[in-house]
Amino acid sequence: MSAKTKVKTKKSRNSKVPASLVWFEIPADDIKRARKFYSSLFGWKIKAFPNMEDYWHIDSGGAHASPDRAIMKKMCPEHPVTNYILVDSVTRASAKVEKLGGKVHKAKTAVPNLGYFAICQDTENNVFALWEKIESAK
């Protein structure tokens, strides 16, 4: 790797590097069936996410397993798996998505006590999400 392309990052054992895949959601028509499928296939422990209807957290190996994941109620027949990518600022990254020809379908939204996200679409019509971890989010 040349000096120009080498990227140095500082992170603790428990932190994620910006641009890392940090979360994904699996949409399901039948959550019970999806829970059974994935827990049987991979041994994932799947539990209801606090204060969220039809949203289930998947534990695939403890607190430091990465990326984190969830099963949720499918919102439409074409609902894709959504990958959440860590960014320093959802606001700045959303603006950059649009500048580069992508679209922001759901603007910056708070997940109380966890952070902010935005749902975007790239130039090839792939859906993805931006994630900014801020525990003071309201």
Predicted regions mapped to residue ranges:
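Short glycine/proline-centered loop/turn elements that form peptide/ligand docking sites
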Residues: 49-54, 110-113, 137-138
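N-terminal beta-strand motif that seeds the catalytic metal site of vicinal oxygen chelate
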Residues: 2-35, 64, 81-83, 132-138
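Vicinal oxygen chelate
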Residues: 21-29, 73-99, 116-121
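Conserved active-site tyrosine of GNAT-family acetyltransferases
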Residues: 34-38, 97, 125
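Conserved acetyl-CoA-binding loop of GNAT-fold acetyltransferases
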Residues: 40-46, 101-103
